């Protein structure tokens, strides 16, 4: 259930009691409503990200980009998605139908589950788990299995090579990513995403982990781009080499699943960069004191109650996340694609030792500080 303010939850429960609705039924309805709201929200986020990528890419190439479908072409992505869903769903005749059909779901579902532990704003989170960040790492590790299933089930050499590349790339960069997350957890003394943000907000903008973990921040950014298969790390679907990689044999809604999953994963990485390193919803700027503590009035049956500016914190989180999105989009059109051996060397020979050394230094610092 989405956590808003306690007063709001208490008043909703009072209304439920007045209407005679059982608490169990209300909990089920509220959970379903929360999940549907999340799905709708992240889907709208994907549409906005695709539109932004088209516009930014067009600007970097001195083109117009989407222009006519809706204001500033913002509905062009929606129209393209509808057209894609109306196409024929083709299944390879000699492929493994079970693996071919199940693979896209295995790839997309873990990405959706990652949103459960992301605090979109102050007290705006579906599930504040005590192991939130490692829940994200755990569900993300399921994705390579789905990629291998799609590559093998397609009965296509390009798809199979793309699946192998994707699995190798994901495994190679997930370890440095996890080590960076562990370093942040040591500094915050918690694995909860909410606790990590609150630990940074104690000291304002100077308390952000960006300043305390600059090396980890760089490793996390590079590993996140590799996990999202963004240029220069898009080897699993390199068009010049593998047609479309593990997506080669897919069409219609199944191909759309990969498309949605890719941008959802990019948004997840952007939000975790914000939560782990950029203070989440916190925006305590030295030249704007008290901005993070602006309150708004909320009218209820009990009178006027002051609550934290939840929606302001939501927009602050999104603005920070979209800064990372801009970096990833700009990198797509400025950096060349690396070779497979270079990608693996970067992950295993450089990022992994650096992330491990950063973790050891962080642990040593914490021991000296606490000792």
UniProtKB/Swiss-Prot annotation:
One cellular-component annotation, GO: chloroplast thylakoid membrane
Gene Ontology MF terms in the entry: NADH dehydrogenase activity; oxidoreductase activity, acting on NAD(P)H, quinone or similar compound as acceptor; quinone binding
Keyword Transport: no
Catalytic activity: a plastoquinone + NADH + (n+1) H(+)(in) = a plastoquinol + NAD(+) + n H(+)(out); a plastoquinone + NADPH + (n+1) H(+)(in) = a plastoquinol + NADP(+) + n H(+)(out)
UniProt subcellular location: Plastid, Chloroplast thylakoid membrane
Enzyme Commission number, as recorded: 7.1.1.-
Transmembrane segments: 32-52, 98-118, 129-149, 167-187, 255-275, 310-330, 350-370
Protein function: NDH shuttles electrons from NAD(P)H:plastoquinone, via FMN and iron-sulfur (Fe-S) centers, to quinones in the photosynthetic chain and possibly in a chloroplast respiratory chain. The immediate electron acceptor for the enzyme in this species is believed to be plastoquinone. Couples the redox reaction to proton translocation, and thus conserves the redox energy in a proton gradient.
Subunit structure: NDH is composed of at least 16 different subunits, 5 of which are encoded in the nucleus.
Protein name: NAD(P)H-quinone oxidoreductase subunit 1, chloroplastic
Source species: Psilotum nudum
Source species taxonomy: Eukaryota, Viridiplantae, Streptophyta, Embryophyta, Tracheophyta
């Amino acid at each position: 259930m989405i956590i808003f303010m306690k007063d709001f939850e208490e008043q909703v429960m009072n209304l439920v009691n007045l209407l005679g609705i059982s608490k169990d039924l209300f909990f089920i309805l509220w959970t379903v409503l929360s999940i549907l709201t999340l799905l709708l929200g992240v889907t709208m986020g994907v549409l906005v990200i695709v539109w932004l990528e088209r516009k930014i890419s067009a600007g970097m190439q001195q083109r117009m980009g989407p222009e006519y479908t809706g204001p500033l072409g913002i509905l062009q992505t929606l129209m393209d998605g509808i057209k894609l869903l109306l196409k024929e769903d083709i299944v390879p005749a000699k492929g493994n139908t079970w693996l071919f059909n199940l693979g896209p779901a295995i790839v997309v579902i873990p990405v959706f589950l990652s949103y459960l532990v992301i605090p979109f704003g102050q007290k705006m989170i579906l599930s504040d788990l005590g192991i939130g960040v490692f829940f994200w790492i755990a569900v993300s590790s399921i994705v390579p299995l789905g990629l291998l299933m799609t590559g093998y089930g397609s009965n296509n050499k390009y798809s199979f090579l793309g699946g192998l590349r994707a699995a190798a790339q994901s495994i190679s960069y997930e370890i440095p990513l996890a080590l960076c997350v562990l370093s942040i957890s040591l500094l915050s003394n918690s694995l909860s995403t909410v606790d990590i943000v609150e630990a940074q907000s104690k000291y304002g903008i100077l308390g952000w982990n960006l300043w305390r973990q600059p090396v980890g921040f760089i490793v996390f950014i590079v590993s996140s781009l590799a996990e999202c298969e963004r240029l220069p790390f898009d080897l699993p679907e390199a068009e010049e080499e593998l047609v479309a990689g593990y997506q080669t044999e897919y069409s219609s809604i199944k191909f759309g699943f990969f498309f949605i999953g890719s941008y959802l994963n990019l948004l997840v990485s952007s939000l975790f960069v914000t939560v782990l390193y950029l203070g989440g919803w916190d925006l305590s700027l030295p030249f704007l004191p008290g901005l993070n503590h602006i309150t708004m009035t909320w009218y209820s049956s009990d009178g006027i109650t002051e609550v934290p500016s939840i929606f302001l914190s939501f927009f602050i989180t999104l603005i920070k996340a979209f800064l990372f999105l801009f970096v990833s989009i700009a990198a797509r059109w400025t950096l060349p694609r690396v070779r497979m051996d270079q990608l693996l060397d970067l992950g295993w020979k450089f990022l992994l030792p650096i992330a491990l050394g950063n973790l050891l230094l962080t642990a040593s610092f914490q021991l000296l500080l606490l000792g």
